[in-house]
Every structure is written in C-alpha cells, then in structure tokens.
C-alpha cells in the first residue's frame, strides 16, 4: 500500500496545469511554476495520499463499498480495471444525474439490466422478431455501458474515489448531500471544495492516474484481507472458548 516520492515523480504527479488556468484554493499545494506550468508540491501530496489510502483501507476492513469514478478518456480503462481488481463498483462512462441521490430509480434500471441479460442468456430473444431482438440488443448495450460497472451495487456506497473533480462536480455534489466521504485527485485548475480526502496531483497523465487508482485498490484489498483475518480469528477464539467450556462440564 506504500507509495514513494520517487514513484510519484516518475509518474509525473507533480505537473499541474498552465498558470493562467488555476484555482487560488489550490495555492497551499503548489510549489511554484516552470514554463508557465504549475508544479505541485509532492511533499504535501504524499502524506495526503497516504491519509486517503488509510481511509480506503479502513472502509474496506469494515466491509464497506468505495465507488470508483473516472470518465475521462485517459482514465476510463484504468478506473474500470483497478476497481474490478479490488472488487468495487465503478463508473467509467457518463455520470448519470441522481446516481446517488436518486438511487431508487437507478436500482430499477439495474434490475432491468440484469433481467435483460438473463433473458438474452436464456435464449428468450430468439423467439422475438429480428427488429425486436435488435432493439433489445441496443438497449442492453446502452444499459451495460452506463451501468455495467455498478450492476452489483445494492445501495449507496460508503465512499467515492474520483479522478478529476472538474469532470465530476455532480458526483461530488451528490455525495456531499448524502454525507458520503469523497476521496479525489485535484489538479491545480480546480477547487478542492467538497473533497474530504484531497490528493493534489496531475489528473491528466495516465501514469499518474494508474498510480492513484492502483494505490486505492491495493489499500482496499489490504483492508478486505484484514477483515477476513479478524473473522477467522473471532471464529477460532469462539471455538476455543467452546472447547474450554466443554472441558469444565
């Protein structure tokens, strides 16, 4: 779960945006500028990233869910792969308004997605006309693209992890309304407002995005492993206590 300064430098996490596109609220995390590009102070970023990793691990150890959100072209594949590796839901296509604040409606769409997938797998569509089957295929593709990453989500998540707050303002606003903690990568051109665990850093480089997403995924896997170990320990202690009581009788 550990991340080093060297890894962050090699991934280009320190490169911000052009100085004319900046948010003054990111000033505390900016080291300076070079060739009209802001340079992010990784000495500030590293401990903040580590705090975010600790939080992600804690959520996972409590058997919580963290929703990964990254819909930018250079983030999509990474977000989907790392979330899947960690066994967590993700949104790598367009964020649908109300995904969190109107989850009841989203749940209905998720049920439709599952029902359609089951019907297709069972061969039910073979009984339909060619036109009807084609329409169903298109509808299923649309639902899969929009909701495929959250099809196993049974309720609102315990936290969300966002890459690029500018792209996902609606997601952060919805999380804030529901009191869901937000972990987010914030570049120099955006405000960190609404983010509980800020990771000041480059949100455009795929190498940097991979470093953040892999770190969060690793932290989640560690947390899950801890949770399983605690359960096994509790079961073992319970069995030993039962044996001791049996001997006493």
UniProtKB/Swiss-Prot annotation:
Cystine pairings recorded for this chain: none
InterPro entries the record matches: Ribosomal_uS2, Ribosomal_uS2_bac/mit/plastid, Ribosomal_uS2_flav_dom_sf
CDD domains noted in UniProt: RPS2
UniProt key word Ribonucleoprotein: yes
Cellular component per GO, a single term: cytosolic small ribosomal subunit
Keywords, comma-separated and alphabetical: Ribonucleoprotein, Ribosomal protein
Keyword Transport: no
Coiled-coil intervals, chain numbering: none
Biological processes annotated in GO: translation
Superkingdom classification of source: Bacteria
A Pfam entry, by short name: Ribosomal_S2
One GO MF term attached to the UniProt entry: structural constituent of ribosome
Family note: Belongs to the universal ribosomal protein uS2 family.
The name this protein goes by in its record: Small ribosomal subunit protein uS2
Gene: rpsB
